[in-house]
Curated annotation (Swiss-Prot):
GO terms for molecular function: small ribosomal subunit rRNA binding; structural constituent of ribosome. The keyword Ribosomal protein applies. GO terms for biological process: translation. This is Small ribosomal subunit protein bS6. GO terms for cellular component: cytoplasm; ribonucleoprotein complex; ribosome. The gene is rpsF. Binds together with bS18 to 16S ribosomal RNA. Keywords: Ribonucleoprotein, Ribosomal protein, RNA-binding, rRNA-binding. Disulfide bonds: none annotated. It holds the Pfam family Ribosomal_S6. The keyword Transcription regulation does not apply. It comes from the Bacteria. It comes from Mycobacterium leprae (strain TN). Belongs to the bacterial ribosomal protein bS6 family.
């Protein structure tokens, strides 16, 4: 298991109250494969540096988790298939 941080930018037309429950369906992929979700931090609606899919704003979510590399790539794949996800960024958070 490796520690990861995933930043997800969601469509700003979504209701911010539904962001957490909708992400839970994706995070179940990590739990099924024996990973652990450490923290889900919903930053809320923020202005983007440049437009993505004709949106000037997005709802930012940062997820800290521990999982196998294959599990994280599957989670990233499933997130990218969702139309309400504008962008994802996966980073390993190992301390050297």
């Amino acid at each position: 298991m490796r520690p990861y941080e995933i930043m997800v930018i969601l469509d700003p037309t979504l209701d911010e109250c539904t962001v957490g429950p909708s992400l839970e369906t994706f995070l179940n992929v990590v739990r099924k494969d024996g990973g652990a979700i450490d923290k889900v931090d919903i930053w809320g609606r923020r202005r983007l540096a440049y437009e993505i899919s004709k949106h000037a704003e997005g709802i930012y979510v940062v997820i800290d988790l521990k999982a196998a590399p294959a599990t994280v790539s599957e989670l990233d794949r499933q997130l990218s298939l969702n139309e309400s996800v504008l962008r994802t960024k996966v980073m390993r958070t190992d301390k050297h």
